[in-house]
Amino acid sequence: MPKKDFYEVLGVEKGANDAEIKKAFRKLALKYHPDKNAGNKEAEERFKEINEAYQVLSDPQKRAQYDQFGTADFNGGGAGFSGFEDFDLGDIFESFFGGGFGGFGGSSRRRNGPQKGPDVQYSINLTFNEAVFGVEKEVSITKSETCETCTGTGAKPGTNSKTCPKCNGSGQIKVQRNTALGSFVSVNTCDMCGGKGTIISDPCSDCKGKGTVRKQKKIKVNIPAGVDTGNVIPIRGQGEAGVNGGPPGDLYISVRVMPDPFFKRRGDDIYIDQHISFAKASLGTELKVKTIDGEVKYDIPSGTQPGTVFRLKGKGVPHVNGRGRGDQYVNIIVDIPKSLNQKQKEALFAYMEASGEIQSSEKEGFFDKIKKNFK
């Protein structure tokens, strides 16, 4: 039976580097692992081939011999798992089962080292003007902070933590199991120290050995001009306290802007409706237009039609953390009066006659009808 090409088994080129080989192995090991293919003999054999290929190609000396002689006869090494100590199987199972797959270690190897604290999320409501022009706000949050009494060690001042006798300070316990596939070494979090590698025999009275305490803290937040609903403002180092001397997490302020009854916002542009009489729309006029900066004068031409939109350049919302501003758009609404006095009726009738909408001979009868309609 011809020997299989280990490069073909892993699906990589002969010139593949270590990272490419490891990536290919992870993908295939996840796909064909016996735990995922219970009772599938074909998958079990495939997994053995994948493991054997990886054992050879991941070892520079074995790979060199394999490339030169086309064989990897290393004392009948087979498909055992003894070479997996340098490969974190937890990475594979975390990607399949989610974070922290028990029994394989993964991130547990790093639990006794410094870790950044969790981030904190906070929502804040702003008025329309606060969002447009920017504002300084003070928020009050409850979060964990490093205990000042023990400076985060968790131990009573004047005492020290001790190395865990069960894991000898590593924070993890290795368990070797013999299976049909070979010798399998798994890494578990030490149940005595919780993965920290140390044990506190005399805990701090303030934090009860945790190294952190819950506190309410007031933080001033500078809201930049131009923010809008959905924007998130990061504040570095104001999250939960770090673990094992790690830095604190970050605070993320989520913005929600309350609507304004007059101004409508779309991005950095502002839209308003401007009501004018049909006479002013016909003759043209100077309007006093309300903007976020106050009133401005704007001339509209004669014959302006309902629905005409004028642009006031640079009168919109400031761009966040940038130069310039959006624009303001003015939508013209022509108001038609629901009632007219006698002089207004006569003026309109004169307009109709002047524009040829009625003939002189129709004047008396038509005017009588108009008078009846407006009584």
UniProtKB/Swiss-Prot annotation:
Quote the SUPFAM superfamilies the UniProt record gives. Answer: Chaperone J-domain (SSF46565), DnaJ/Hsp40 cysteine-rich domain (SSF57938), HSP40/DnaJ peptide-binding domain (SSF49493)
* Its job: Participates actively in the response to hyperosmotic and heat shock by preventing the aggregation of stress-denatured proteins and by disaggregating proteins, also in an autonomous, DnaK-independent fashion. Unfolded proteins bind initially to DnaJ; upon interaction with the DnaJ-bound protein, DnaK hydrolyzes its bound ATP, resulting in the formation of a stable complex. GrpE releases ADP from DnaK; ATP binding to DnaK triggers the release of the substrate protein, thus completing the reaction cycle.
**What cofactors does the UniProt entry give for this protein?**
Zn(2+)
Biological process, per Gene Ontology = chaperone cofactor-dependent protein refolding; DNA replication; protein refolding; response to heat
Q: Where is the J domain?
A: 5-70
Organism lineage reads as: Bacteria, Bacillati, Bacillota, Clostridia, Eubacteriales
Per its record, how is this protein called by name?
Chaperone protein DnaJ
Q: Where does Zn(2+) 1 bind?
A: 147, 150, 204, 207
